[in-house]
Design a protein with these regions (language model features):
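C-terminal alpha-helical cap of glycosyltransferases
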Residues: 284-302
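Acidic donor-binding loop of glycosyltransferase active sites
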Residues: 202-212
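A nucleotide-sugar donor-handling region in carbohydrate enzymes
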Residues: 78-141
Length: 302
């Protein structure tokens, strides 16, 4: 079994422990004051380093999914920044000490913590049409497989002048397919890789996205109605359940139902307002600043 327990370490731990001496040498060479990691593997490595007295500076982990992923319980860092206070019992049950848990939230870039008006985002920045309902479809950094089918279904159902912006990420193939498919449809805007995701979020009325931790958090902080599409089993499933249970998003595993949910949100002011209110209660836009403050305190030994 690969899962660890309080009595034994997993093969994952021992594999990452092999990097301990190299990481210790790198840290010493560059004279770092503190280490922050959003990933399990370096946390495993630094746990080994602490055990062997090879790590002499503080180390902090930042969780980027709305669940306690496997193997966190066999790590031993100074603090664990987690997405939400409701996750504390799950982490504690898995064996992470409660006094090390800080529910600051998932940090996002400052652009996502500021909202531009739709007029500024659409007209002055992105040159998109004003006064029309607009969907934003996020494919993820590599695009998701059923994007072309989903886009065709959504475009077919948009009969009231709605526009669709599709961000394809790094998937050049799906971008070419969609540009060809919607070449004559002026209400569908195909975007490849872009550094302006925050602006597109400001411009849209409803966002479709897979339930990844970072994209979901960015949408939550932006206070945008969210329709979650089919998750990759594992962390994304946990993220979807966390958001759904708190009315931060709606979701369905069926493509046609996903389209229907987005249409309902864009057409029903009351539904959007209810989700917006829930998001305002749960979002944590100050996460990044709180983490920076924590690191400064640890470095200054306060």
């Amino acid at each position: 079994m690969l899962i660890s327990s309080s009595r034994r370490k997993s093969p994952v731990y021992f594999a990452n422990a092999l990097l301990g001496k190299k990481l210790a040498s790198y840290i010493a060479k560059h004279d770092f004051d503190i280490v922050v990691t959003p990933h399990l593997y370096p946390a495993e490595t630094m746990t080994y380093m602490k055990k062997k007295k090879l790590l002499h500076i503080p180390a902090v982990a930042v969780g980027t999914d709305y669940t306690c992923i496997p193997f966190w319980e066999e790590t031993d860092l100074d603090y664990y920044v987690i997405p939400h206070e409701d996750l504390i019992p799950e982490y504690v049950k898995r064996g992470v000490p409660e006094e090390k848990l800080l529910p600051y939230g998932i940090p996002v870039q400052q652009d996502f913590c500021r909202n531009l008006s739709k007029e500024v985002a659409r007209k002055k920045k992105l040159h998109l049409p004003m006064d029309v309902p607009m969907f934003l479809v996020m494919s993820g950094s590599m695009g998701f497989g059923k994007l072309a089918v989903f886009a065709a279904e959504l475009a077919l159902r948009c009969r009231n002048g709605e526009h669709i912006v599709i961000i394809c990420g790094n998937n050049a193939k799906i971008e070419r397919i969609l540009r060809k498919e919607f070449h004559f449809n002026k209400r569908v805007h195909i975007i490849g890789y872009t550094n302006h995701v925050s602006l597109f979020m400001d411009a849209c009325d409803v966002i479709y996205t897979k339930p990844g931790g970072l994209t979901s958090t960015r949408s939550l902080v932006k206070n945008i109605p969210i329709v979650h599409t089919a998750p990759i089993p594992g962390c994304e499933t946990a993220n979807l359940h966390f958001f759904g249970a708190r009315h931060l998003s709606v979701s369905s595993k069926h493509l046609a139902k996903q389209v229907q949910l987005g249409k309902a949100l864009i057409e029903n002011d009351s539904l959007r307002e209810q989700m917006s209110e829930a998001q305002c209660r749960e979002r944590k836009p100050e996460a990044a600043m709180q983490i920076v403050s924590l690191l400064e305190r640890l470095v200054s030994h306060e």
